[in-house]
């Protein structure tokens, strides 16, 4: 079942928008847990794979169990990332920036995510 989205969340997840840099609640978030899709609650990213890229959006160097679909943007310049379960737009993935050993950065809009804290689910 899909969650009812706010107008701002709809702008990101459905209309493929981008929130302003450094505006999202998860940009500097550091709690242990799982980031899930705001629209369908599918697990997407672990806090173990989150890192500070100082780019203005939450950054991860891996996804959970092939939970993210990757599509080349229409202009071919960037690769869009979507929730594999509901198709919600999450952001983009970038390669070759050398932030981590995996050498990939999932650049994700905070508005496309919810967070499940490990402490609360234990």
Stretch-by-stretch model annotation:
Residues 2-122:
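A short Gly-Trp-Pro
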